[in-house]
Structure formats: structure tokens, C-alpha cells
Amino acid sequence: ILFKTGKTQLNAQYKVLLKDFFPRYIDVLSPFKNSISEVRIEGHTSSVWNIGTSDTDAYFFNMKLSQGRTRSVLEYIYGLDAVAPQKSWINRHIAAVGFSSSRNVLDGDGNEDRDRSKRVSFRVITNADIKIKQILESK
């Protein structure tokens, strides 16, 4: 469990994982920096909120929660000594995005897997579309 229910603070175990993972992740991406438009830290929640909460309210409460969690991750990784030389690139290319419950994980029966839906992931967005346009325009 990365976060306590309804909370945005990183737990100690997740901090250890991020401290190990993120500097290596940046190193792996480094040779491809010119092809990367953005790296997104994506926050997701289950669709559940407190009993009696409307679906609309639950969606927006979960939006705030998912955004807060991604911000917590970004703040933590930004402060890591191991990525200090990359801070300028991080400032320009890493975004924290909350998706609320809009991208749930489904089980084998097509039902929401509430535990697996609560997650933070990293997604690389390339600038391939820009490169393709440049190639086509140069012909």
C-alpha cells in the first residue's frame, strides 16, 4: 500500500522504492531526452468514496486525492540528491497529473479491482508526432 486511504503523504516504504527507482529511471531516459516531450507522474484512485457520496462528488474528491498524491511523489523525487544534476530537465519535462477514477484497473470479470486501481505510474510521452511532421514537411 503506497498511501493510506484518503491520504496524500508518501509512506516510508514507498520513499525507499522511489529513491532507488527514480534516479535509475532518469538515467535510462537520458539518452532519449531529445525525443521526450513529457514524463507524467499519473495518479489514479478507485471509484469509491464515503458511503452516501454522490458519484460526481466522489469523482472530484478522488481527483483532488490523485492530484495530491502525484504532487507528493513529484516533490519527493525532486528533492533527491541523486537527481540534482537533472533538476533543470525535470522542471521542464515532468508533470504530476491526477486522473481520479477515470482509468480503473479491471479484474478478469470486467469489474473494478479497487486495490489495483489505487496507483501512481510514470508515463513517457514522446515528441514523435513533431518529428514525423518535420520529416513530412522537409520532403
Where are the language model's segments positioned?
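Extracytoplasmic beta-rich ectodomain segments of secreted or membrane-anchored proteins
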Residues: 1, 11-36
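Periplasmic OmpA-like peptidoglycan-binding domain that tethers envelope proteins to the cell wall
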Residues: 4, 12-15, 44-138
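Short beta-strand elements
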Residues: 34-40, 90
